[in-house]
Amino acid sequence: MNESKDLKRIQEFVDRLKSTNSTNDKIDIIKEYEEDYIIEKTLKYTYSPFKQFHLTSATVKKNKKLEPREGYNDLFYLLDALTKRTITGHDAIQYVKGYVQYMDEWQQDLVFCILDKNLKTRTGADLINKAIPKCIPTFKVALANSYDKQKGKVNFDTQTWFASHKLDGVRCLAIVDDNGTCNFFSRQ
């Protein structure tokens, strides 16, 4: 990744999306970048519910006493390290500070928007997926239905059904990945 050049291209894309309130225009703009690897990767990292960075720009900015630490010169390597929790806590803050320390203010703002998972373009995963189908993985929690509403439609003799006790306040799914790591996801 050529950081300066790629960040400029991402910022131009963001500025174009910010320049219109029309949903159809936003979809058209996103479609123009469908073959752009960096833009698509930026959208995936920013809007995928399965990519969590465990750090916000506010946390980075408020820890003024922590000195920047250099070690990452590629945005996506840094974000991968945050997602995989290779770097955490004060180390994570220091590496992010080290990554942005020599950047122009607009570049820092862009990196912080990606870190906060919001490019501030008034777009989301649904709109992006209308323009580029399946670009952003979505997470849909199955919602319960009352048995009384389904009573005539259910045939326990010929269909397989699973039931679970509904617990108030517990609205999440546990997903075990290929490495055996269990992650919990909830509706946003």
Place the predicted regions along the sequence by residue:
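N-terminal nucleic-acid-engaging modules of covalent nucleotidyltransferase systems
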Residues: 1-188
